[in-house]
Amino acid sequence: MSRETASSEITPELLLRAYACGIFPMAESVDDPTLFWVEPKMRGVVPLESFRIPSRLARTVRSDSFTVTVDTAFDAVINGCAAPQPGRNNTWINHRIRELYIGLHELGHCHSVEVWRDNELAGGLYGVRLGRAFFGESMFHVVRDASKVALVHLVARLIAGGFVLLDTQFVTDHLRGFGAIEIPRRRYRALLDVALEGRADFGALPLDRPVPGAEALKAIADRSS
């Protein structure tokens, strides 16, 4: 699909079909109104069975110095992900990307994890759920460790719900610290095919209340039981 026509032709429903084929849209910048499809030769994934948490971060999660919720402030999270951050002045999240993923959220296929401190949004992440796969789109923080806490809570929810694939699209140094790896496209597609079979439960951990850090850590610790 050409860059000039992609933006107008993509719908939330088409976007889901694209994810099932292993592709996703991006924009060059927040000011570029057009979108283009991406299918990396090397795909970033976080193997849930070997997800690791640095000990300092585990203490932060357990301390509940942050309050973590799900799907209570989706628009605010995607706006936070689109905003400039230290070391990241440009963003690929343009207006059309916002519209599409808000549409997916309204269909129940896109979720946010919000991290709060003193009733202010300190960080979070959002991504797409399809079958037993979760596709992480973006994360942000305005308070140290907030996005990392969001990721720990996301992984706990995925493990508790029977998910088998956490797709990060690309791998950063930040994600490598949690065990993220790159795999070839063919291997990724094989994992995706398996993940699209069956269903997982994003609500295996409570959706209607904040989840304590100890509960999230226990879900991760119990993954092999």
Swiss-Prot record:
In its UniProt entry, what is this protein called? Leucyl/phenylalanyl-tRNA--protein transferase
For this protein, the Enzyme Commission number is 2.3.2.6
Known catalytic reactions: N-terminal L-lysyl-[protein] + L-leucyl-tRNA(Leu) = N-terminal L-leucyl-L-lysyl-[protein] + tRNA(Leu) + H(+); N-terminal L-arginyl-[protein] + L-leucyl-tRNA(Leu) = N-terminal L-leucyl-L-arginyl-[protein] + tRNA(Leu) + H(+); L-phenylalanyl-tRNA(Phe) + an N-terminal L-alpha-aminoacyl-[protein] = an N-terminal L-phenylalanyl-L-alpha-aminoacyl-[protein] + tRNA(Phe)
List GO BP terms, alphabetically. Answer: protein catabolic process
The entry's family comment says: Belongs to the L/F-transferase family.
Query: Where does this one sit in the cell?
Result: Cytoplasm
The record ties this protein, via Pfam families, to: Leu_Phe_trans (PF03588)
Query: Function of this protein?
Result: Functions in the N-end rule pathway of protein degradation where it conjugates Leu, Phe and, less efficiently, Met from aminoacyl-tRNAs to the N-termini of proteins containing an N-terminal arginine or lysine.
| An example Gene Ontology molecular-function term | leucyl-tRNA--protein transferase activity
| SUPFAM superfamilies the UniProt entry points to | Acyl-CoA N-acyltransferases (Nat)
Gene3D superfamilies linked: Leucyl/phenylalanyl-tRNA-protein transferase, C-terminal domain (3.40.630.70), Leucyl/phenylalanyl-tRNA-protein transferase, N-terminal domain (3.30.70.3550)
Which keywords describe this protein according to UniProt? Acyltransferase, Cytoplasm, Transferase
What Gene Ontology cellular-component terms does the record carry?
Answer: cytoplasm
